[in-house]
């Protein structure tokens, strides 16, 4: 920050377009290192790098994403697939920060939401989703993005871009808690503490 000079570049792949916005940083106990992570806008892929800025893992997801989020209160990286097309943009992939493997997938349908194990395909949790319809009366597939941890650590909040609501989920499990409705194109941040800065 003092010299405002380039420190390094992280190569995420020959055709990858990492999103320049919010990434994630977390400590991996097995490696004993602080790791970094980003989604890629045009690929279903989360890129993980170590504290030497070397890429150590490419984790497949459902499609291109914009945001990946975490905090010390959740065991997961929460990666959206909002640019992955209609078949994928209603899911968020939860990656275990210690194993660096996909742990569960949140999917929000037009009438039901699920949290599933990606290996066994077992449904871990499910809930009823209020159907939102367009001007022609057709049910809208929720386009979900930007998992944001609440400051108190109990919840993670996920925007539903085209449905005017935010989904609240348990940070430790991904289990659905409730909706906040009546919003217009919710996209970004909800935790004031995460965006405050101290002048000086």
Feature map (PLM): residue ranges:
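Predominantly soluble domains enriched in secretory-pathway, periplasmic, or organellar proteins
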Residues: 1-200
